[in-house]
Curated annotation (Swiss-Prot):
EC number(s) from the headed UniProt entry: 3.1.26.3
Domain RNase III: 5-147
Family matches, as Pfam families: dsrm, Ribonucleas_3_3
Chain positions recorded as Mg(2+) binding sites: 40, 133, 136
GO MF annotations, alphabetized: double-stranded RNA binding; metal ion binding; ribonuclease III activity; rRNA binding
Subcellular location: Cytoplasm
Protein name as catalogued: Ribonuclease 3
Matches recorded under CDD domains: DSRM_RNAse_III_family, RIBOc
Family the UniProt entry places it in: Belongs to the ribonuclease III family.
Keywords: Cytoplasm, Endonuclease, Hydrolase, Magnesium, Metal-binding, mRNA processing, Nuclease, RNA-binding, rRNA processing, rRNA-binding, tRNA processing
């Protein structure tokens, strides 16, 4: 196993019985066709369940709608990015030349709005969406390697130094949270999100995401430079439709 993966494994406090899962979790689609996006998809669901369980235990007096707000704060891209920075994850990521090398710098500049000011010349290693997605992929990899209990334990370790309180709820009321609260107040199931298209170069993709409410027969779409942002855009479009129809 590569030294950077050994260091990451030690920080995760999980020894993989299948090292290939760790390898894939740290491989971006710009590097190989055997990339981490399916693990990210799985890890996203495991993360939400584990965080929901954590909040259910810690904030026992909080009602459902407010729990959803706190959870949204904890699992949003910026929060996951900050958690990922505490791990040697950026060093272990395998990225294509367009992200890790000095080539195609002009192409990268076209996505400059997605980079943080201190990321110039970093080759995308500290790009928030890449690191946040990779962290979700790691959670998915641990789940496949050792089951839900191990993945849940990892999530608990990741959040052990994060202050979790009802005060977090105001910062998290984004479009997805607002839509989920609207549905919950009407005793309806959460919306369904699905990536329906991904276009553009690997280092500068655009995700088209569909947001559906089967009970109402409604579907709206949104596009952005990451899956999470695409979901927010789709949720915002759905909220606009609900408002326009006076629902």
């Amino acid at each position: 196993m590569r030294p950077d993966l050994i260091a990451l494994q030690e920080r995760l406090q999980h020894v993989f019985s299948d090292p290939g899962l760790l390898e894939r979790a740290t491989t971006h689609r710009s590097f190989s066709a055997e990339h981490n996006e399916r693990l990210e998809f799985l890890g996203d669901s495991v993360l939400n369940l584990a965080v929901s369980s954590l909040l259910y235990q810690r904030l026992s007096a909080l009602p459902e709608g407010e729990l959803s707000r706190v959870r949204a704060n904890l699992v949003r891209q910026e929060s996951l990015y900050q958690l990922a920075l505490r791990l040697p994850l950026a060093q272990a990521l395998r990225l294509g030349e367009s992200l890790s090398g000095n080539r195609q710098r002009r192409s990268r500049r076209r996505c400059a709005d997605e980079l943080q000011p201190d990321e110039a010349g970093s080759g995308g290693l500290q790009h928030p969406s890449i690191l946040a997605d990779a962290l979700e992929a790691l959670i998915g990899a641990v789940y496949l390697d050792a089951g839900y209990a191990s993945a849940q334990a990892l999530v608990q370790r990741l959040f052990q130094d994060v202050e979790i309180s009802p005060r977090m709820q105001a910062a998290a009321r984004d479009a997805k949270t607002a839509l989920q609260e609207w549905l919950a107040s009407r005793k309806m199931k959460p919306p369904q999100y699905q990536v329906v298209a991904r276009v553009g170069a690997a280092h500068c993709p655009t995700f088209e995401v569909a947001c559906g409410i089967p009970a109402l027969g409604l579907t709206e779409r949104g596009s952005a430079g990451s899956r999470q942002a695409g979901e927010q855009a789709a949720a915002a479009a759905m909220l606009a439709t609900l408002k326009a129809r006076n629902l």
